[in-house]
């Protein structure tokens, strides 16, 4: 006959097992709820100021007073010089920047500026977008932000065809601006170094091209309308690096860690928009050497060696934003 103490032990073990199973299920549901936001049949309500309030909690002492794009009037008479050099400020690059701002623009399109509540999606370049069929849903957002040279032509079913803004830097400008963008797309230069300003000036003014000072040769011919070019305020790079990744603003020359264009775009969207969704973010696990990282090309994590990006640290930052509801994800993360 089984003793009472034996029965008590078995009952306790069974209870522990039930609790463990319940906790596992609840955690799995919570993970899905936090990090994967299926496309709703109806538009999600857009609450004015929602992203701003979440950003304030995320970034601390945060203000929307900063302009999104650098403006000529702020550099014609510089009253408060920037504290940092590129990519976190413009210290030492003011004269070159002034020439670029004189031939580009800094305005936000009226159709975006006039929106009472701005619904935005940041479309990453991740492999998760392949066969996602998110194209129609992406096209319905007020603002669609794309990154670098990610193609649209041929992938419309998965990534959509609308492009409000495309963030790029010289080395990532290897795309046809007329094929991969819309006629009114804003091409937003993310400057990492003074040579980036020099490059865009020579392209737009048809001056002698610069070939040195880049880790990859940028285009020498680039058919764009100067009035579609914007220069991103380095403030957003500073916020992404400092508040999201805790990177020091002054780093040894050999280290030079910096945020990816994707994390930078999310930071920008939280400043510009009232509702922020993301799609196509995330990288394979470090041990997965064969999984491609982009939806449009066959390259792996190995290609990011020496890039100065800490993708694991960025993943934690994005998950933190997802957990607090500052952003929502249209693809798994």
Curated annotation (Swiss-Prot):
Where in or outside the cell? Golgi apparatus, Golgi stack membrane; Secreted
State the disulfide connectivity: 120-273
Q: What is its main location?
A: Golgi
| Keywords for the protein's UniProt record, in alphabetical order | Disulfide bond, Glycoprotein, Glycosyltransferase, Golgi apparatus, Lipid metabolism, Membrane, Secreted, Signal-anchor, Transferase, Transmembrane, Transmembrane helix
Report the transmembrane regions from the record: 9-26
What Gene Ontology molecular-function terms does this entry list?
beta-D-galactosyl-(1->3)-N-acetyl-beta-D-galactosaminide alpha-2,3- sialyltransferase; beta-galactoside (CMP) alpha-2,3-sialyltransferase activity; N-acetyllactosaminide alpha-2,3-sialyltransferase activity; sialyltransferase activity
Where do the record's glycosylation annotations fall on this chain?
61, 131, 310, 329
Write out the PTM section of this UniProt entry. Answer: The soluble form derives from the membrane form by proteolytic processing.
Task: Give the Cytoplasmic compartment stretches of this protein.
Answer: 1-8
Q: What CDD domains does this protein's entry cite?
A: GT29_ST3GAL4
Its recorded reaction(s) are: a beta-D-galactosyl-(1->3)-N-acetyl-beta-D-galactosaminyl derivative + CMP-N-acetyl-beta-neuraminate = an N-acetyl-alpha-neuraminyl-(2->3)-beta-D-galactosyl-(1->3)-N-acetyl-beta-D-galactosaminyl derivative + CMP + H(+); a beta-D-galactosyl-(1->3)-N-acetyl-alpha-D-galactosaminyl derivative + CMP-N-acetyl-beta-neuraminate = an N-acetyl-alpha-neuraminyl-(2->3)-beta-D-galactosyl-(1->3)-N-acetyl-alpha-D-galactosaminyl derivative + CMP + H(+); a beta-D-galactosyl-(1->4)-N-acetyl-beta-D-glucosaminyl derivative + CMP-N-acetyl-beta-neuraminate = an N-acetyl-alpha-neuraminyl-(2->3)-beta-D-galactosyl-(1->4)-N-acetyl-beta-D-glucosaminyl derivative + CMP + H(+); a ganglioside GM1 (d18:1(4E)) + CMP-N-acetyl-beta-neuraminate = a ganglioside GD1a (d18:1(4E)) + CMP + H(+)
Q: Which InterPro entries match?
A: Glyco_trans_29, Glycosyltransferase_29, GT29-like_sf, Sialyl_trans
Q: Which Gene3D superfamilies does the record cross-reference, listed alphabetically?
A: Glycosyl transferase family 29
Pathway(s) of this molecule: Protein modification; protein glycosylation; Glycolipid biosynthesis
Topology: which residues are Lumenal?
Answer: 27-333
Q: In which tissues is it expressed?
A: Highly expressed in adult placenta, heart and kidney.
The membrane topology of this protein is: Single-pass type II membrane protein
EC top class, in one word?
A: transferase
Family assignment from sequence similarity: Belongs to the glycosyltransferase 29 family.
Functional description taken from the UniProt entry: A beta-galactoside alpha2-3 sialyltransferase involved in terminal sialylation of glycoproteins and glycolipids. Catalyzes the transfer of sialic acid (N-acetyl-neuraminic acid; Neu5Ac) from the nucleotide sugar donor CMP-Neu5Ac onto acceptor Galbeta-(1->3)-GalNAc- and Galbeta-(1->4)-GlcNAc-terminated glycoconjugates through an alpha2-3 linkage. Plays a major role in hemostasis. Responsible for sialylation of plasma VWF/von Willebrand factor, preventing its recognition by asialoglycoprotein receptors (ASGPR) and subsequent clearance. Regulates ASGPR-mediated clearance of platelets.
| Name used for this protein in its record | CMP-N-acetylneuraminate-beta-galactosamide-alpha-2,3-sialyltransferase 4
Q: Lineage of the native species?
A: Eukaryota, Metazoa, Chordata, Craniata, Vertebrata
Q: Source gene?
A: ST3GAL4
């Amino acid at each position: 006959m089984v003793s009472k103490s034996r029965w008590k032990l078995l009952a306790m073990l069974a209870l522990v097992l039930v609790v463990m199973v319940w906790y596992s299920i609840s955690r799995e549901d919570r993970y899905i709820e936090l990090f994967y936001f299926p496309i709703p049949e109806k538009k999600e309500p857009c609450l004015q100021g929602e992203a701003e309030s979440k950003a304030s909690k995320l970034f601390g002492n945060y203000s929307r007073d900063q302009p999104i794009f650098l403006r000529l009037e702020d550099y014609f008479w510089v009253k408060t010089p920037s504290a940092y050099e590129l990519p976190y400020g413009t210290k030492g690059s003011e004269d070159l920047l002034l020439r670029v701002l004189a031939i580009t623009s800094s305005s936000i399109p009226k159709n975006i500026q006039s929106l009472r509540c701005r619904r935005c999606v940041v479309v990453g370049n991740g492999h998760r977008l392949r066969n996602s069929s998110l194209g129609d849903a992406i096209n319905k957002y007020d603002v669609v932000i794309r990154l670098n040279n990610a193609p649209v032509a041929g992938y419309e079913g998965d990534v959509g065809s609308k492009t409000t803004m495309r963030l790029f830097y010289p080395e990532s400008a290897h795309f046809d601006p007329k094929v991969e963008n819309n006629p009114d797309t804003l091409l937003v230069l993310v400057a990492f170094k003074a040579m980036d300003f020099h490059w865009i000036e020579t392209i737009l003014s048809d001056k002698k091209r610069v070939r040195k000072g880049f880790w990859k040769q940028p285009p020498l011919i680039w058919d764009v309308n100067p009035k579609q070019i914007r220069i991103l305020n380095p403030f957003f790079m500073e916020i992404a690096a400092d508040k999201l990744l805790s990177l020091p603003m002054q780093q040894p020359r050999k280290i030079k860690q910096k945020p990816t264009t994707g994390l930078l775009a999310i930071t920008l969207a939280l400043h510009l928009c009232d509702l922020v969704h993301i799609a196509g973010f995330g990288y394979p696990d470090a041990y997965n050497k064969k999984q491609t990282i982009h939806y449009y090309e066959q390259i792996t994590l190995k290609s990011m060696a020496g890039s100065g990006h800490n993708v694991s640290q960025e993943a934690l930052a994005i998950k933190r934003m997802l957990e607090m509801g500052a952003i929502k994800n249209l693809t798994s993360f």
